[in-house]
């Protein structure tokens, strides 16, 4: 089976938040995110095969698969958690996280890795939820969540550098961000 088409059978229910990505784990150990990788104004799928660490980009026209291309292979111990344009070059960049909470940003030009930098390390008990430009400075910021207190937080970034933080709303009892391990849950839905 062609690795670029094997993902077609995976149920993917991505949620786009202010043109930022929220990652969903899908059936079969694959993960997905959304961004416009080829600059045609249409969202494209970014897929990760957790078994091979390979990423693939599916170029879409509305809901129609147009073409596919491989992206960089992720290193062992790191997972793809999102995509946003951190260096403001007009190309989506990968956000990675490892088991210690360390984040990294891989700068891309199309599907080609052109550089990388470590981002801030998440505090224990907090999980990365998504990215969006909350303070309007043109750089994506991290959205974090802790299930212990149901508190959300925004980490303001300048490229890969932590600038400041603010607590967001506390989620009501019984509500949470979506379970990223269930392919039928919407990420970042309350």
Indicate where each model-derived feature is located:
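Trp/Gly-enriched beta-strand/coil motifs that build multi-repeat beta-propeller-like domains
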Residues: 29-190
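Sec-dependent, cleavable N-terminal signal peptides
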Residues: 1-32
């Amino acid at each position: 089976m062609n690795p670029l088409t094997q993902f077609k059978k995976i149920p993917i229910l991505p949620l786009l938040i202010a043109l930022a990505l929220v990652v969903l784990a899908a059936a079969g150990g694959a993960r997905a995110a959304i961004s416009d990788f080829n600059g045609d104004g249409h969202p494209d799928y970014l897929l990760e095969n957790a078994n091979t660490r390979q990423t693939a980009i599916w170029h879409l026209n509305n809901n129609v698969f147009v073409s596919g291309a491989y992206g960089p292979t992720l290193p062992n111990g790191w997972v793809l958690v999102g995509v946003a344009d951190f260096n403001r070059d007009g190309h989506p960049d990968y956000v990675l996280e490892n088991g210690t909470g360390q984040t990294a940003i891989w700068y891309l030009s199309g599907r080609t890795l052109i550089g990388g930098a470590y981002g801030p390390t998440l505090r224990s008990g907090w999980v990365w939820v998504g990215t969006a430009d909350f303070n309007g400075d043109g750089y994506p910021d991290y959205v974090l969540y802790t299930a212990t207190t149901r508190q959300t937080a925004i980490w303001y970034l300048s490229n890969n550098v932590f600038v400041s933080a603010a607590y967001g709303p506390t989620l009501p009892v019984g509500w949470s961000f979506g379970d990223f391990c269930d392919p039928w849950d919407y990420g970042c839905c309350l």
